[in-house]
């Protein structure tokens, strides 16, 4: 069985329509943050009822968020997806990212001066204890999705806040509006960048697997030429990809691991910290 994350927006509604005849269950999260939230939920409910599709809904109300709302919302969303995934014994979760998302994510990474192992978003990966599949990531641009929905007369909701430049992704997205040729050039550039990283990625994965087999011991880590990459993968795996590491932070972590001083822990964020326990590197929850 496949789990499909459906917000009620155009991308996920097309994804749902494409897979409606498969063995699926739908998960919808309503944050009740926008006036149109109930409308989006009803769109998903109506479609699933009409097509006899299993639907699980998480309704979040009366909450206070300290810090970044998007980080908080992402954690709530994926915690819920994991529960549904396990309840129905799913083999993968489908997400509706498309080519525009691929380009936007790359530009966000560049803006934040990040140097990831893989630029932008992978079509398939394993995270949060789930097999994640993004069928549209190299298939459709946003304008193509909208045309298909129009032709098939599929209802969807538009998030009115997407037009507001209150978040970095919104600013990048709105700046790329009607710049189709530029988007295509950037898309091709990302594919080339990732292609030339493949050999290095394979070697890094070998080093990481070897380090993992040794229970993440300090000595094996220090032998690797790819310490920055190993730290990125290690932290991502241990925190369910909930921490965005800057290069400066990665260097601080490496310095902490290398240090012979009696430093007990390295704070990663409000939820996680790193420790050196008997020459073994561990990530623990507070």
Swiss-Prot record:
Q: Which organism encodes this protein?
A: Mycoplasmopsis pulmonis (strain UAB CTIP) (Mycoplasma pulmonis)
Q: Which family does it belong to?
A: Belongs to the tRNA(Ile)-lysidine synthase family.
Q: What top-level class of enzyme does the UniProt entry assign?
A: ligase
Molecular functions per Gene Ontology: ATP binding; tRNA(Ile)-lysidine synthase activity
Protein name (Swiss-Prot/TrEMBL): tRNA(Ile)-lysidine synthase
Q: In the Enzyme Commission scheme, what number(s) does this protein have?
A: 6.3.4.19
Keywords linked to the UniProt accession: ATP-binding, Cytoplasm, Ligase, Nucleotide-binding, tRNA processing
Biological function: Ligates lysine onto the cytidine present at position 34 of the AUA codon-specific tRNA(Ile) that contains the anticodon CAU, in an ATP-dependent manner. Cytidine is converted to lysidine, thus changing the amino acid specificity of the tRNA from methionine to isoleucine.
Could you tell me which NCBIfam families the record lists for this protein?
A: lysidine_TilS_N
Q: What is known of its domains?
A: The N-terminal region contains the highly conserved SGGXDS motif, predicted to be a P-loop motif involved in ATP binding.
GO CC annotations on file: cytoplasm
């Amino acid at each position: 069985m496949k789990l499909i994350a459906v917000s009620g927006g155009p991308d996920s509604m097309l994804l749902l329509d494409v897979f409606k005849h498969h063995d699926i269950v739908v998960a919808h999260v309503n944050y009740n943050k926008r006036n149109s939230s109930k409308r989006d939920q009803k769109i998903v409910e109506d479609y699933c009822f009409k097509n006899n599709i299993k639907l699980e809904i998480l309704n979040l109300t009366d909450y206070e968020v300290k810090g970044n709302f998007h980080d908080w919302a992402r954690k709530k969303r994926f915690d819920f997806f994991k529960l549904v995934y396990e309840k129905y014994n799913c083999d993968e979760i489908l997400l509706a990212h498309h080519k525009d998302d691929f380009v936007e994510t790359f530009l966000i990474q560049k803006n934040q001066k990040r140097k990831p192992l893989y630029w932008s978003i992978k079509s398939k990966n394993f995270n949060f204890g789930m097999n994640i599949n993004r069928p549209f990531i190299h298939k459709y641009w946003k304008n193509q999705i909208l045309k298909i929905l129009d032709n098939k007369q599929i209802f969807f909701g538009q998030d009115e806040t997407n037009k507001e430049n209150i978040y970095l992704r919104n600013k990048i997205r709105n700046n790329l509006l009607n710049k189709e040729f530029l988007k295509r050039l950037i898309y091709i550039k990302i594919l080339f960048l990732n292609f030339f990283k493949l050999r290095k990625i394979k070697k890094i994965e070998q080093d990481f697997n070897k380090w993992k087999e040794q229970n993440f011991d300090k000595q094996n880590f220090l032998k690797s030429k790819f310490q920055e990459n190993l730290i990125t993968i290690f932290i991502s795996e241990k925190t369910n990809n909930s921490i965005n590491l800057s290069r400066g932070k990665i260097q601080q972590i490496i310095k902490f691991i290398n240090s012979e001083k009696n430093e007990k822990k390295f704070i990663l964020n409000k939820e996680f910290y790193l420790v050196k326990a008997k020459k073994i590197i561990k990530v623990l929850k507070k």
